[in-house]
Structures are given as C-alpha cells and as structure tokens.
Regions:
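PLP-dependent amino-acid enzyme catalytic core
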Residues: 1-426
C-alpha cells in the first residue's frame, strides 16, 4: 500500500501537530554556536546537531510521525521501507518501539555500520534485505514487496507524513533561536530526495518567510539541480554513492512541488565530494563531531556563500552514521581535493640509479612518496611505476611538474575523474 499523499499543502500547524505527536519518542537536538565557522565566515554560525538523535539522524522524525498514524489494520499487515541507511534506522526504531513488524531494503553500497545499526534498532521486529546497486533499485524492490503483501510503505522522503515530520527540525530551530532573542537569516540544508528541505520550506513559509534556505547537494548526485534546470523531476543516469545519505537519482515528486512553490527563498548549491571530505575532517578535529558525508554537506557550503557580518546562519548536521573504516578514503579524497595528493605513471629507464635520480632531482624537500608500485620487465628499455606523492603545499605542484618535464624520466600525471585515474588509483 503506497502512502504517498494527495496534497502538497503543508502548513506550520501540520508540523506543530507532528511535533506534539513525536515528542514522547524524540527529544530536541542541540543548536550549538560554532566559534570556528563564525570566525571563518564573519557571520554567526549555529550547528543543528541532528546526528545526536538516537539513530544519529533527523530521519527518525519523519519515520516516527508516519508510523505513529497507521491504523490497527495497517500495523498488523506490517510495513516496508527502502533507504540508504538513515531512514531505515528510523523505521527500525519505530517498529521495535511500537511492536510493528517491518521489512527494510537497503542498497549494496550501504555502509556496514548502517546495516548493523538497523539490526540493533529493529531487533526481532525487522528483517533487513540488501539489494540493488543504489537507493532507487532498493526502493523498486520495496514497492514490489508492498504490492505483493499489502504492507504499508513508509517513504524516506516522497510522502506528506514524512515531510511533515522532517519539518519539525525547522520548528525546533526557530524555537531555540527565539529563546536567545534571535531569528535565522539563512538555514543551510542537505538535499538528497528532498524530504528535509521541503519540510523546512513549508514551515518557514508560515513562520519565518524572510529566512533564506540553501539546499546543498553533492556533485555526484545533483538531483534537485537537474530538476530545477528541467523544471520537473528528472532521473539522473548515475550517481556517485560516496555521499550515501544524499545519493538519490531523482528528487521526490511531492518534494519538488513544494520546493517549486518556494523558489524565491531557495538557493541551490552543489559541492564536491572532496570538499565534503575536507569538512568532515575539520568537524572531527575541531568540534569533535563525527559527521557522515551527507551530514557535512551544509557546513561545506559555507565557503561558497556570501554572508553578512550580522547574519545568523544555521547549518544542519543531518547525520553521523559513518563507518570509521571509510576514513582512509575520506582523508584520501580530501588530500586530492586540496591539491596535496597526486598520482603519476612514471616510465623509468631500466638503468641503475634512475630511482635515485627521481628522488634527488625531481622530488622537493617536502614531497613524500605514499605509493610505489613497480614491475621490472626483461628485454624492455623502460619500466612503468605507479607513484603517489603527497606534497607539503599545493603550490609545490607547479615546481614538481617543471622538474619532471626537465628530466629524461617520462612522467604522466593522472587527473582525478579521468578513466585512467579511476582504473589505476580508485
């Protein structure tokens, strides 16, 4: 049974009812002033720390709001959901706390940490099914199951009750700032399928229409930007699954309808995955915040915004379900993004002393070899090595290339995003 709503009309009163409905289960999250980001931007930056929810994501709001309104018959028939991980945890939490059987579909790219947490939150009330290469394929499987069994689908973003539940984030932000005698000039929101941003836009339209909303997407999954250009939801050919909490091929239809009504206050923005990784590291090292990639989208956008010195800006840290095993890739992507990590295919003449020459004549004093793979071949004049270099400063790159060009050793830079780079390095 599909739960998609007939109307896109959502008002502050709907969100306030949802807030009362979920208050027994979900406690408000902190709104915390961030000195570092305030100093960097010149504005007054606050972090809405949704990663501190029981399931480490705001997604629990929409899930609990939707499930708590099911009829006895719907509860008995069970529920089904598809998710990249965070919505699934919210659904699992609600299933266990309300005693409702559930079946949850997640794509194969879902980090193990998120899968394990789904099992913890759902206990024996939830069955986890891993299927499909991305969210859209997992969602198709969930819809097929619902058609076969009569289970109710709890949509992760494209349903009215889910959107209304996510809108309670905005209600809390306004209330918390009001208690300080302040109101937000801008709220920066991560965007995947559009559930959070459409809920926030709906609430602000009634309660704070002057507040601007920045919608931030990863460059590898810009479904909202594609929809805005086409003036309707479109399906992307492919998405980069790295920012898994926002890796959605198509913005929700109902979500886009709400967004379209609020274009006057919306500022869409796309940021690179490398920039997201850099901010994930900054949040951890400075604020002690473990954010997942989607959770760092909002803060990553700050460097792209023109903010006034008196502006009050809220960034939503949407989730903190990050597998520590991913941090090696996070650091790698950040170094490449900042121009500190480079890869080269180097053809060494197969003569004694060539590696020594590379080290002494080409590398700078602060350059470090992080990868060296070489296979010596007989009856060949040259042998190829894959070399990874970490520079002391990004500005050292031009000098490195000049020394390579002046050398008799043939060096070819592998540029991120090219097929050669993806094949050899990734």
């Amino acid at each position: 049974m599909n739960q998609t709503a007939v109307t896109t009309e959502i008002h502050a009163a709907d969100v306030q009812l949802a807030q009362a409905r979920i208050s027994a289960t979900i406690a408000p999250t902190p709104l915390q002033y961030c000195p570092r980001l305030s100093h960097l931007t010149g504005a007054e930056i606050y972090l809405k720390r949704e990663h501190l929810q029981d399931v480490r994501s705001y997604k629990i709001r929409g899930a609990v709001n939707a499930i708590s309104q099911l009829s006895d018959a719907q509860r008995a028939a069970g529920i089904v959901a598809a998710s990249a991980g965070n919505h699934a945890q919210g659904v699992a939490f609600a299933c266990r706390s309300m005693g409702i059987p559930g079946r949850i579909y997640v794509p194969a790219a879902t980090p193990k940490q998120k899968r394990d947490r789904i099992k913890v939150h759902g206990g024996n009330m939830v069955e986890l099914v891993v299927t499909g290469a991305n969210f859209d394929e997992a969602s198709a499987a969930a819809h097929d199951y619902a058609e076969e069994t009569g289970a109710t689908i709890i949509e992760p973003f494209a349903a009215r009750d889910t959107i209304v539940g996510q809108g309670t984030v905005a209600a809390e932000i306004l209330s918390q700032l009001s208690a300080m005698g302040k109101s937000p000039d801008t709220i920066v929101v991560p965007v995947g399928g559009g559930g959070l941003i459409s809920g926030i836009l709906s609430y602000l339209a009634d309660m704070s229409p002057r507040t601007a909303v920045v919608g931030v997407e990863p460059a590898g999954a810009p479904s909202l930007n594609a929809a805005l250009k086409a003036e309707k939801p479109v399906t992307l050919d492919a998405v980069d699954p790295f920012v898994d909490g926002a890796a959605v091929k198509r913005i929700g239809d109902i979500n886009y309808q709400i967004i379209e009504k609020n274009l006057g206050r919306l500022h869409p923005l796309v940021v690179s995955e490398g920039a997201v990784c850099t901010e994930m590291i900054e949040l951890y090292q400075n604020e002690g915040i473990i954010a997942e990639p989607a959770g760092a989208l909002s803060v990553t956008a700050l460097s792209e915004l023109k903010l006034g010195t008196d502006d009050i800006v809220v960034c939503i840290i949407s989730g903190g379900n990050n597998d520590l095993l991913r941090y090696a890739e996070v650091v790698e992507r950040s170094l490449v993004h900042r121009g500190l990590k480079h890869y080269f295919l180097v053809n060494f003449p197969q003569e004694p002393g060539q590696l020594r020459s590379f080290l002494s004549d080409i590398l700078g004093p602060d350059d470090d070899i992080t990868l060296f793979e070489y296979l010596k071949r007989n009856n060949r004049e040259t042998g190829t090595a894959l070399i990874g270099l970490q520079l002391g400063r990004a500005s050292d790159f031009d000098g490195l290339v000049e020394r390579m060009n002046a050398s008799r050793i043939d060096c070819r830079h592998l540029k991120p995003g090219t097929p050669e780079y993806e094949f050899v390095v990734s």
